[in-house]
Amino acid sequence: MKQLILFLLCLSTWTAQAKIYNVKDYGAKADGTTIDTPAINRAIEEAASQGGGTIYFPAGEYACYSIRLASHIHLYIEQGAQIVGAFPSATEGYDLAEPNEHTQFQDFGHSHWKNSLIWGIGLEDITISG
């Protein structure tokens, strides 16, 4: 009986972490024109609220601004899928750069992280594969 309970506990833990979140189910179009960032970030937020999971990118071109990672997230990019940095518009763009006391001594690209295509700070258990 103890072995059965232990097995079921392990199985439920594995199942919870193995959930797959298809970004198209959250509104991503993957047409190379539509900005898919909101859909991708919603999928990541949903997975994070459930303890983590796999964010699945089916084939297509995902035009994006800042994708915000969370702990225990696996980005799986299927063959034929691309995540492409989009050009900012007058009303949309990448996350604002965080304040940095050394800005006057370094160029912008080496001093800031939050305005990147894919970023996260203080996270653990992150993988990107495909």
Where are these regions (language model features)?
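Bacterial Sec-dependent N-terminal signal peptides
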Residues: 1-20
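Extracellular/periplasmic carbohydrate-active domains that bind, remodel
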Residues: 17-130
